[in-house]
Amino acid sequence: MNIEQFQSMLEEKGISLSSRQLEQFGIYFETLVEWNEKMNLTAITEKEEVYLKHFFDSVTAAFYYDFSKPFSICDVGAGAGFPSIPLKICFPHLKVKIVDSLQKRINFLNHLAQKLELSDVAFCHDRAETFGKKEGVREAYDIVMARAVARLSVLSELCLPLVKVGGTFIAMKGAAANEEIENGKYALEVLGGELKEMSTFQLPFEESERNILLIEKKRKTPKKYPRKPGTPNKLPIEK
């Protein structure tokens, strides 16, 4: 996906990028590749691949959810900033918090935010399991997002405690999401969430399947969740 295709395919979905926003994506790409030489941020470094599999793929969430309001967003395990930084570039009014367990990635994101001149972006070096227990962030976000971090039964325990009641947890998944949903239904129920919508589409050019799950927070999450670091992965909430 070249830059012109990136721009026109977003335009088709009602997302018009200014020359400044396109410049920000260019700076993002250059900074990602430069830092990737000294630390492992991504296996994808070829320009057209980055624009398709990282930038465009991140923004697809906005094809199925309206980001036009100044929502507070928490991105769990964003790694090199996906999906929240591409969304922030497209929708500058969003208030973004990224939580990642690796300090080196947080250093990269701080540097990136300065280079992109982003405001209303904050980064936290923490495990999602401990972050989700903290006062002031628990059940504080309009939207919590995660892209390809863990299977749904595990991911729900990391993300739903952070979503305010009435807010949305957006899980961005690859193929075979139906099986994950089946295994994750019980966890959603326990944690106060309910699957509202699942959208399946093909990523252009390479035609690989993507699924976006919109999960509504219906009730408060029981205080015992999230459990201590590592437990959600070892003992997921499954029947």
UniProtKB/Swiss-Prot annotation:
Keyword Signal annotated: no
Location within or outside the cell: Cytoplasm
Cellular compartments per GO CC: cytosol
Positions contributing to S-adenosyl-L-methionine binding: G77, F82, A128, E129, R147
Highest taxon above the source species: Bacteria
CDD domains reported for this sequence: AdoMet_MTases
Major subcellular site: cytoplasm
UniProt-listed Enzyme Commission number(s): 2.1.1.-
One GO MF term attached to the UniProt entry: rRNA (guanine-N7-)-methyltransferase activity
InterPro entries (UniProt xref): rRNA_ssu_MeTfrase_G, SAM-dependent_MTases_sf
Alphabetized Pfam families for the sequence: GidB
Keyword vocabulary terms for this entry: Cytoplasm, Methyltransferase, rRNA processing, S-adenosyl-L-methionine, Transferase
Family named by the database record: Belongs to the methyltransferase superfamily. RNA methyltransferase RsmG family.
Function recorded in the entry: Specifically methylates the N7 position of guanine in position 535 of 16S rRNA.
Name this polypeptide is given: Ribosomal RNA small subunit methyltransferase G
The encoding gene: rsmG
